[in-house]
Amino acid sequence: MLNLGGPALAGNPDAGKTKAEQKCAICHGPLGLSQNPGAPNLAGQPAIYLVEQLRAFRGGKRQHQVMSIIAKPLNDDDISDLAAWYASLVVSVKQPQ
């Protein structure tokens, strides 16, 4: 059973986009598609998953040299907004011919 302790999906994607441009794009790409092999793609990920991961980094349950520092000052609204933004991005795959 997954309990995130509050509204996880009520974020504002527009606010999330602004926050992502400031805090996330350098590693995860401006549209959540990373060119950095050490940073995962975030575009199209389920909001509930992103909320859980950001809260884990913020709370110290999950450790990463960069993400732990970035997530620490995020409040629940920041996390919900970021999750809503990345979850709203549609990822399409071009099939090889």
Each model region followed by its residue ranges:
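N-terminal, post-signal-peptide region of Sec/Tat-exported proteins
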Residues: 34-70, 74
